[in-house]
């Protein structure tokens, strides 16, 4: 399998490109996504896929998440870049109630494909309302899957898994890792399975579990 050294955000972007080419029901929306997004993961998407599938929105995170819930029921596969994890609190009803629970509340015989991208943590100058680690919120709501990639390879592989997942996924990219670089597989079928641990060092005396 061939590899290329690239940045964490670029690896996320590669996954988006590959999956949008493969599946025309995927579209992305958020503030500034048509011009590359907050951290560059969406760079070039509007040029290739057009503004019908790469949609700039105003500053209303609740609207973005609500649109994703409705589009999911209609059979589309929305991706929402919320800009920062802090904004999970603004869109909480749509994410933690509607996206997470509608299938089960209403007996819907449909998948709820949706990926919500939350950049979390901080880097210089982000400010107190753009620096929270909100991934723990999603862990307490049945119906959601939560991922937090720690390197460029996982950023690509987990994004591809999230885009193929029939349940809503909260994809937490780490701001401080945004421009870190690593070897990324170029195989368009490379996926990191959600929910399967990577064993970094096998042993029998002690287990350390982290993310």
Residue ranges and their predicted role:
Residues 92, 195-196, 202-203:
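Glycine- and Gly-Pro-enriched alpha-helical subdomains that act as flexible
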Residues 135-136, 196-198:
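Short, flexible, solvent-exposed loop/turn segments with mixed acidic/basic and small polar residues
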Residues 1-177, 187-189:
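Thiamine diphosphate
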